[in-house]
């Protein structure tokens, strides 16, 4: 990544709703209340997902929790009822209802407001450095507002989110 503009001193993020141990560089974030920022949770499918499947195998490193809604550019959000992290290769997210469309391997997924394709958090920046997530309290990290990102070296970010990241160029 090539940074052109960042937020000096970084940003403060809520950490209590994050389901992973690390916040990875390139994760989209958006502004919440009182100057605090929130993570727009993202993931990628580990395998092809059948249209009738309620189980999503996703890459490790996501922050989804039971109760979150997860969507894709081609699929409305569905509620996650459980998260199974037993496998060393992938996690299994069990949905209340299937997506009803086939999702190819490496499909970018994101947190939605509900049964729609509206991002739960409207992203305006990307996390500047990977950071350990504390179990309680707040998390401080750098944030890139204007940057150039090599897609092959970054986390999978859905087109729905990219449309909000107007000052981030994906090459």
Model-based region annotation:
Residues 1-171:
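Surface-exposed, low-hydrophobicity beta-strand/loop segments enriched in small/polar/acidic residues
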